[in-house]
């Protein structure tokens, strides 16, 4: 026996329903084509107003449904191919849909514009209801922006999966065109960004008639002649101090040779280096002078530390007790009285005041530790039971009261003690 088509099943043999009742197709638990004992079919009442749209009253039966039949599935799913057209036209045959697909594709290829039922325009159909979005309701082709083709014609731009995506792609293409046009204009002008190392220099930077190329040549020549004469970068700095009274460090000379100084500073340093270069080539004793200056700097003795005997120290302590911060005139009188230099007396008073501040800080810290602290430390409570020495010996120990056994459960029945329970 052939299985009947959906919505054309005969009624149960022992059950018949009136024409005013129709099958509810939205119930997913009803499996009409299942070859097993059928489940009870739910029904809902069809009012006459709705029933008159589909036919007369006597025509409303279990198989009188004008909706397009679909392949049955237990749960709804998406069908991306021409669901809008199928729902709107109501063609029940899949062959007709295939013919429409081929016809729409051929028309799209001939006209060059996508149709509203194209697979590129998605539609999300819902079973037993009309589609929420049926594409272009007017049936006209969507006006998509066209892009100039290299052959001379216009090539239509294909739409993306959604209108929002198409707008975003158009915006990104516009930005790319702007960036490419800016780059092409910069390339036409011949502009180029300078390197990070030479960011402070430029091809047109000139100061005192010196260009960057001339500065590079001079730095290269300076390094070659310095190595040939046997001088170090530190020797050049000392020589500039001996000859011109302005000493430079080895780091400054190194940065000049490697062009890491600013162009303005290099222009200021170049005349001194040119004079030193001429002096080094003509004066043979220059290197000896440099070594002598370096030895004098190394052998320069530090000032001897002043030592005070007990008598002198006692007299200074007496003046300090009278006035801890004397003025310039008082310091001069004390230095004259003790036969010392004024700076020595001044430094001694400064050191003595600092020593007094340190003593006051230590005494305050000791009083805070030895006195009553606002918050008791946990070591005091531990020492009560475990025999540890208390942190503050001057404070009397604290002994907690015994455990209140009888007052533990005051809500219990009177006469019931916390001792041994008697049965």
From Swiss-Prot:
Residues 94-110 have a biased composition (Basic and acidic residues). Keywords: Developmental protein, Differentiation, DNA-binding, Homeobox, Nucleus, RNA-binding, Transcription, Transcription regulation. The keyword tRNA-binding does not apply. It comes from the Eukaryota. One of its GO terms (cellular component) is nucleus. GO terms for biological process: cell differentiation; negative regulation of activin receptor signaling pathway; negative regulation of DNA-templated transcription. It is found in: Nucleus. Residues 111-120, 156-173, 194-203 have a biased composition (Polar residues). Residues 207-281 form the POU-specific domain. CDD domains: homeodomain (cd00086). GO terms for molecular function: DNA-binding transcription factor activity, RNA polymerase II-specific; DNA-binding transcription factor binding; RNA binding; sequence-specific DNA binding; transcription cis-regulatory region binding. Residues 301-360 bind DNA. Residues 85-211 are annotated as: Disordered. InterPro entries: HD, Homeobox_CS, Homeodomain-like_sf, Lambda_DNA-bd_dom_sf, POU, POU_dom, POU_domain_TF. SUPFAM superfamilies: Homeodomain-like (SSF46689), lambda repressor-like DNA-binding domains (SSF47413). Belongs to the POU transcription factor family. Class-5 subfamily. Transcription factor that binds to the octamer motif (5'-ATTTGCAT-3'). Antagonizes the activity of nodal/activin signaling during gastrulation to suppress mesendoderm formation. Acts maternally to inhibit vegt and beta-catenin-activated gene transcription, probably by forming a transcriptional repression complex on the promoters of target genes. Binds to an octamer motif in interspersed RNA. Interacts with the transcription factors tcf7l1/tcf3 and vegt. This is POU domain, class 5, transcription factor 1.3. It comes from Xenopus tropicalis. The gene is pou5f1.3.
